[in-house]
Each structure stands twice: as C-alpha cells, then as structure tokens.
UniProtKB/Swiss-Prot annotation:
One GO molecular-function entry: GTP cyclohydrolase II activity
CDD domains for the chain: GTP_cyclohydro2
SUPFAM superfamilies noted in UniProt: RibA-like (SSF142695)
Self-association state and partner proteins as the record states: Homodimer.
Reported function: Catalyzes the conversion of GTP to 2,5-diamino-6-ribosylamino-4(3H)-pyrimidinone 5'-phosphate (DARP), formate and pyrophosphate.
Keyword Transferase tagged: no
Active site, per annotation: 126 (proton acceptor), 128 (nucleophile)
Protein name, UniProt field: GTP cyclohydrolase-2
Amino acid sequence: MQIKRITEANLPTPWTNFLMIGFEEIKTKCNHIALLHGNMSKNTSILTRIHSECLTGDALFSLRCDCGFQLQSALSHIANEKCGILIYHRQEGRNIGLINKIKAYSLQDKGIDTVDANYHLGFEADERDFTVCVEILNLLQIKSIRLLTNNPNKVNVLTSAGILITERVPLIVGSNPSNTKYLYTKAKKMGHLLNNK
C-alpha cells in the first residue's frame, strides 16, 4: 500500500455538498483528495472521475486545455446523479510538474504540440501513474465504477488493476479556439476519444 487515509471534512460547492477525504502517499508525502457525494453502498457502479491536477485550467481558468471545464462538468454530473466520486490526482501537467508544464507551454507558443513539447523536455507524452487512484478506490471499497473519461488508457489501467468499469462516460466540454490544436493532438497522438462515443 502506497497511500493512507488522513482526514476528512465537508466541502460545500456550487453543485452540491461533498465529503472531502485527504490521502497521503507514504513515501513521497504527496497529498491527494477524493470528493464523495451520496450513498456509495446503495449504488452498484459508482460514477467516478479521476481528475489530474491542472492549476492553470482548474484555478486560473486557462483556455489552453479542457481541464477546468472537465472538472466543473464532472462535479455537476456527480451532483445530478446524486452519487459519485471525484479523485483529485496531484500529478500536475501529466506528472511533469508545474514549471515543466510552463516550459511546455512556451514550446507550444512556438508551434510545437503538447506531446512533442513533452518529448523535447525529456518526458514521455504522459508521465502519470494511476496506481494511487486505484489504491484510493480500494481504500474506499469501490470495486465497480462508471468512469467519466475520454482517455482509454485510464480505462485500461484501472481494469488491469481489478477495478470493474461498467461504462465509460464521455466528458467532452470546453472546446474553444485556444485549445483546438491541443484537443486534436490528444485525439490523434494519445488516443483520447473526443467524438462523444
């Protein structure tokens, strides 16, 4: 086990009230949170979003990506369903870190796409490790989910780790002139499913 449950508190939001649970990685001391809403024991397949940290999109309202739009849409979906979980996965910039993400943005300003910018900086296209997310689901005794994602890799990783995914729920929001190339690259080079299927 790489992670432990530390604390919890209520979190009122514009969408609904959530129970916010704080987790800590044992080796790195990195913190992650899970937002829970509704009665998990009464639902056989929990609507779930694994949302990787994006300071620029989530907190600064950047139009360069669709992250902030996805975060808000996921919280709204969970509120409407009256049950669900959002794991806020603290791996900024597909786990290259904030400063390297800004460096990648600088390269994108020069015409390099989001994947090649990572390669240029010495990283893989996606450096994220979803092991912690699997452990959070296991600690919360959630074994069957409906996953809010456009990323087939998340589906594969969670399925391989023993999480039953009964449905992939598309989360296609936030397209705008500033992120058209970014979204095209995610679909073409990273296999993201952006056609609502």
